[in-house]
């Protein structure tokens, strides 16, 4: 009987380690206006996020680090969707420009780690009105991976 408990305990630990993450909450989108009215995007600078972990290979522990700048992820996805990314706000294009603000809005802890929730806010450059917001969680091997996954999920939900 003692052996059965050990096997069940080992199985439970293995499953929790290999699953690595909790089920992520669905991404949400709140649309106030049509985003297709805009063709240009200005994304204010964001700070690079660094994350590190360790990987065990053949009994050796190897450090692994990763960094991501949320602005780069947002710009990559939006440029792929056909938006023109501006390095600065230009008065000539204000009526067709949307400003995208990034923010970490929550952190949810669970047994083996946490998720990071990000919110992206789309604001009209000409009127200052809120066009839409999108929020999503991310959970990866590092904080940088969490943020990258969350931003990607939020934008994917927006363009669904």
Q: How should each PLM-predicted stretch be described?
A:
Residues 153-160:
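C-terminal alpha-helix
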